[in-house]
């Protein structure tokens, strides 16, 4: 049986506009948001900072949690973020650095 992992996450813009979503691949989904590959709210409001997430083994639990968080008022959402990420740093800020272009070291040819 294939093991699944689901995440409920919150993205924020620089002005702290919040977006709540759910995915089965957090790294991929955040990368899509950061690169504006998804038309809609996050692209329009530039919600590119991952400020909070939770992981679930069961998709139904993840969906329930996403719906619950979306019903919460702004103050309660900010309280939750502050518990784990008081400065609202981008949790995914360094996830993709290895994908940036870095020239390889030049190896001198062997004398032969």
Regions found by a protein language model. Give the residues of each.
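Short arginine-rich
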Residues: 44, 68-80
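GIY-YIG nuclease catalytic motif and its immediate N-terminal context
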Residues: 1-38, 43-53, 60-67, 84-86, ...
